[in-house]
Swiss-Prot record:
InterPro entries: AAE_transporter, RCK_C, RCK_C_sf, Transpt_YidE_put, YidE_YbjL. GO terms for molecular function: monoatomic cation transmembrane transporter activity. The chain crosses the membrane at residues 4-24, 29-49, 65-85, 95-115, 158-178, 371-391, 403-425, 439-459, 465-485, 493-513, 533-553. It is a multi-pass membrane protein. GO terms for cellular component: plasma membrane. Residues 191-276, 279-361 form the RCK C-terminal domain. It comes from the Bacteria. One of its GO terms (biological process) is potassium ion transport. This is Putative transport protein ASA_0825. Belongs to the AAE transporter (TC 2.A.81) family. YidE subfamily. PANTHER family: K(+)_H(+) ANTIPORTER SUBUNIT KHTT, TRANSPORT PROTEIN YIDE-RELATED. It comes from Aeromonas salmonicida (strain A449). It is found in: Cell membrane.
Length: 553
């Protein structure tokens, strides 16, 4: 059997064994994809005992390519929410998440200095303690750039594997301790979150307003205060018994009924100007108007602004809502269309069909993936990751590497959405498949390389001490941030649990938090808010640690 065939066969065995281990559950908590690492350690141990060696170049390529696939697809997935999570609504959550990452770095650096822990070991323990695999890859890359011994990869892998189990358990323990210390009642916390969420964030609302203000009589819609700010869409106008689709130059009269869509505060402003709210139905039933939902799939309209399509003027159709990645937006004339946008159209059936032909609405395209943008993104990411950044006071250049470069490029490209006929939308099923393949390949190689000396290190070497270091890196930041967020951040417990799970990029912990109150979305919302920024920080932090500690700073 050739070296390549042998390597692929062994890694397949590792993947099968590891995924099987990952499916085991103890009280609802399991290793998940992390089981592949331990499958690799088991196979690597017996391969070492049998003096079976695999081709190093093949293993290295598979490891790096798997890491690239994983971080790129993560970036594509979280990119649309990354930049919005940095705005004011997520500043507090992201601030606490960044504090947790910084505290972990401080604890790791302190352990390195106090106990003279080898740099590869403390970086591996740091990555395992926070259950973050891309962090491990970034650390291995920067050590190679700094000229560390090739054996450091194995040391990092062993440190990661030793610290990983408590990294998963430690966050669950922290959630339990915070709940016990503050005597928290889950149902009350869920109700508190729902009340707060109702005041601070809401989906789009609708209202029917009768025009009673004589000063508005004869004005065009675009001339009405508050309607010209693009915060509210008028999707229907009823005059007498006639229901019509209004245009920006449509003139209103006293007694007209307007059906408006927008956020609650914006609708209230329009109500104060126009007249009074009425309960009369402006349903399209029994009329020649229809309401349809269509999906943007036509490459020719991607990136174009709604005003450029001139849908109102040409087709007498109103876009009343726009749903992008699950978030409802008020579609303004300045809104650019992206692949996968869901549009709410109001108009006559033939006109809606004409607009549908313009925007696409080909459902099959949502299940297809353009491969060209994938490799363009990966190529650009690798190039970006190879560019050295020289910072004052640092003894070595900082690089994003194969873990950070593709991630940053993916975040940017997914935010842009499309360039010409190229779009970076990736069907969720395809994204998940590539992401899982990538992380399985990476963990399989890391585990296999670590397996030869893992058992000896754990039993006869410094394994127990490494485990204690990992416990400190896991628990200290979690407990500090958990208490601060509760006491000073006035954060609800379920939101706090999502914050802690997201800060550790730990899906099992999120599943545990969701299980406390299955009907509340508080934990999932805070997890998704901090996840993009934390993933970026987790990739950058081991590189900064490695450079600073390498120079003895």
């Amino acid at each position: 059997m050739s070296d390549i065939a042998l390597s692929i066969s062994m890694l397949s065995l590792v993947a099968v064994l590891g995924l099987w281990l990952g499916n085991w559950r103890v009280y609802g908590v399991g290793l998940g994809i992390g089981g592949v690492l331990f499958g690799g350690i088991i196979v690597g141990h017996f391969a070492g005992v049998s003096d079976l060696a695999l081709d190093e170049q093949t293993l290295h390529f598979i490891q790096e390519f798997g890491l690239i696939l994983f971080v790129y697809t993560i970036g594509i997935q979280v990119g649309p929410g990354f930049f919005s999570s940095l705005r004011s609504s997520g500043l507090k959550l992201n601030g606490f998440a960044a504090l947790l990452v910084i505290l972990g770095c401080v604890v790791a650096a302190g352990l390195h200095q106090l106990f003279d822990v080898p740099l590869p070991v403390i970086l591996g323990v740091f990555s395992g303690a926070v259950t973050n695999t891309p962090s491990l890859g970034a650390g291995q890359q920067i050590l190679a750039e700094l000229g560390a011994d090739p054996g450091s990869t194995g040391l990092m892998g062993m440190g990661y594997a030793v610290a990983y189990p408590f990294g998963i358990c430690g966050i669950l323990l922290t959630m339990w301790l915070v709940r016990l210390f503050f005597r928290i009642k889950i149902d009350e916390e869920a109700d508190l979150f729902e009340q707060h969420a109702g005041k601070t964030k809401e989906s789009l609302q609708t209202i029917n307003i009768a025009v009673r203000n004589p000063n508005m009589h004869g004005l065009m819609l675009c001339e009405i205060p508050s309607l010209d700010e693009s915060d509210v869409i008028c999707s229907r106008l009823k005059r007498g018994e006639e229901l019509m689709v209004p245009r920006s130059d449509s003139r209103i009269e006293l007694g007209d009924l307007l059906h408006l869509v927008g956020e609650r505060h914006a609708l209230h402003k329009v109500l104060l100007v126009l007249g009074e709210e009425v309960e009369t139905s402006l349903s399209t039933r029994g009329t020649d108007l229809r309401v349809e939902r269509v999906v943007v799939t036509n490459e020719q309209v991607l990136g174009k602004k709604i005003r450029d399509l001139d849908i109102k003027q040409k087709y007498d159709v109103v876009i009343s809502r726009l749903n992008r990645a699950g978030i409802e937006l008020v579609p303004t004339s300045q809104t650019s269309l992206q692949f996968g946008d869901i549009l709410n159209l109001v108009g006559r059936l033939d006109a809606i069909e004409a607009v549908t032909n313009v925007v696409g609405n080909v459902q099959q395209k949502l299940q297809q993936m353009q491969m060209l943008p994938v490799f363009i993104g990966i190529g650009l990411g690798v190039l970006l990751g190879s560019i050295p950044f020289y910072l004052p006071g640092f003894p070595a250049a900082l690089k994003l590497g194969l873990a950070g470069g593709p991630l940053v490029v993916a975040l940017i490209l997914s935010r842009i959405g499309s360039i010409g006929k190229l779009y970076w939308f990736m069907p969720p099923s395809a994204n998940l498949a590539l992401r899982e393949i990538g992380i399985v390949l990476f963990l399989a190689v890391v585990g296999f390389k670590s397996g030869a000396g893992f058992v000896d290190t754990l039993i006869n070497g410094d394994g127990p001490a490494w485990m204690m270091y990992g416990m400190a890196i896991t628990l200290i930041p979690l407990l500090v941030v958990g208490v601060l967020a509760r006491l000073y951040g006035k954060m609800s417990y379920l939101t706090l649990c999502g914050l802690l799970a997201g800060s550790m990029t730990d899906p099992p912990a999120l599943a545990f938090a969701n299980g406390m109150h299955p009907t509340s979305g508080a934990s999932a919302l805070s997890y998704a808010t901090v996840y993009p920024l934390v993933m970026f920080l987790r990739i950058i932090s081991p590189q900064l640690l490695a450079i600073l500690l390498w120079a003895g700073v």
